[in-house]
Amino acid sequence: MNDFEPTNRKPKIRNATKTLRVWPGNDWQESEPEELGFDRAKLTEAGRYQANIAGDQPYRILIVRHGKIAAEWNFRTDPASQADQASASKSTFSSILGIAIREGVIKSENDRVSDYYPEMLDVAQGEGPKDGRYAFPENDSITFRQLIGNTSGYMKPGEAPGKVFNYQTFGMNILTHAIASAYNLYKTSNPKQGAGFGTLTEWKIRNLIGGTWSWKYGNFEMHAKAKLGVFGYMTSYQMTPRDMARMGWLWLNRGNWNGDQIIPAEWMDKATKVSSEILENEPPERHIYGLGFWCNDQAQVWPDLPKDSFAASGAGNQHIWACP
């Protein structure tokens, strides 16, 4: 909005302590900020701050509370267009892992990934993404938990599984391929032939919560011998702000959508807290990541914000921040 005011402008109710949560249908309900417990003046101040730091750069911000839109800003961009979620997609990967474990397709987060996707070990020296990156014997013990928590050390000689927090893409690709393979949806010999992990997400989450997002595979430019079918083909979701809000609302409600437990609640509780691997092996300032989510329970990511807050974040300033 050009005046940087919240979408809704007429104050109604100041006390929102008894406001009930609702779920969107085809679209979201909108409400006055005060009705949802927001201070209109502070929202306006936040909008002006965003405008000042953005300058001429486009941006979109959507604020939801109790299942209703409280404020929205769109500057030089179409609010209905889709944006690549980049690494913010990893939080959705985590959600599907939790579902796959509940369904018994993956027996445990602590299972060895190579038991489901042995191809991950078939990357010799000279076949990885660059010099020094290849699958080595210790990678055979990597677990699903280590992959989603970015502590796997996959194709990182010298990094023992579960010991080093190293934010990476290729380990996440192994995660999605292993899960999709367990559902018989991915083949390294022809990655684009199978339905893929993105379609699995549509079946297990998107269609159940009324989302509209699409997905695509992405690859970095690599040398000719790189085994992209094994460790490439990243699943990336293309979402509108309202799609992002649906995912955030699902996560904030511990995986529940209007009474349907889409993602196991116990998985969401676990995934949105800093992992034990990071707590045990990294210094306090790196106590920032759970199982596919940026987590604040150790007050390291956002020291001045509530400890129960967490986020999906990706390149291009793609963020879904939730505060239960």
Predicted regions span which residues?
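Flexible, glycine-rich surface segments
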Residues: 216-278
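Active-site SXXK
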Residues: 67, 83-109, 175-179, 244-247, ...
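Solvent-exposed loop and edge beta-strand segments that line ligand/cofactor-binding
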Residues: 83-84, 136, 159-167, 230-238, ...
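Active-site Gly/Thr loop motif
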Residues: 218-226, 273-323
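Active-site-proximal alpha-helical segments within enzyme catalytic domains
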Residues: 150, 171-178, 235-256, 318-324
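Active-site helix/loop module of the DD-peptidase/beta-lactamase fold
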Residues: 84, 103-154, 184-234, 266
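Flexible glycine/proline-enriched surface loops and loop-helix/loop-strand junctions
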Residues: 78-80, 157-161, 172-173, 180, ...
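N-terminal leader/targeting segments and the immediately adjacent pre-domain N-terminus
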Residues: 1-78, 83, 101-107, 149
